[in-house]
A protein has these predicted regions:
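Conserved catalytic core of the tyrosine transesterase superfamily
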Residues: 1-171
Length: 171
């Protein structure tokens, strides 16, 4: 409303905006939920296949976006340096690093795969197509429902990593 009156004033439709005297009320920002260490462990323990375990570990240890996760190819991984090349928003390329546990689970997942698809994460059934964002979301929601967690979604892993980094003193 104040923007509209400011525009009226700028365009000389009114002399003075009546809302200028009204102070804006600051609304408190809601603190978004993150996963606890216990919740992350329960999700890992609840995975019934190596793909989901590797996926949860990669999301947890790197904080990458779900869109970046599904774009990953096998060739983007460097196990020796525990890093992967991610194509982010605007097709910008950057390196992210994953932990030793993620390395082990990714290697186990890749060693079990029998397909020749270059995609890092593929469907569990033939024809083993690249996993889509919706596939990741559905899978995580299913794990969450089975554990009676409310609202398990990929972005929460990113927020959890950022919150943990801030708690440990990262500026």
């Amino acid at each position: 409303l104040s923007s509209f009156f400011a525009w009226l004033e700028d365009e000389d439709y009114i002399v003075k905006s009546p809302v200028r005297r009204i102070h804006k009320v600051k609304t408190g920002k809601t603190v978004k939920e993150t996963y606890s260490d216990e919740a992350l462990e329960l999700m890992r323990d609840h995975c019934d296949n190596t793909r989901d375990l590797a996926m949860i570990d990669l999301l947890t240890s790197t904080g990458i976006r779900v869109g970046e996760l599904v774009k990953l190819n096998r060739s983007d991984l460097d196990f020796e340096n525990r890093e992967c090349i991610v194509f982010g928003k605007g097709n910008k390329q950057r390196k992210v690093y994953f932990d030793a546990r993620t390395k082990i689970h990714l290697q186990r997942y890749l060693s079990e795969r029998t397909d020749g698809n270059e995609s890092l994460f593929v469907s569990l059934l033939k024809p083993y197509e690249r996993l889509q964002i919706s596939g990741v979301e559905i899978r995580l929601r299913k794990i969450g429902r089975e554990l009676n967690f409310n609202k398990v979604h990929p972005h929460k892993f990113r927020r959890t990593l950022a919150t943990m980094a801030i708690d440990k003193g990262m500026p």
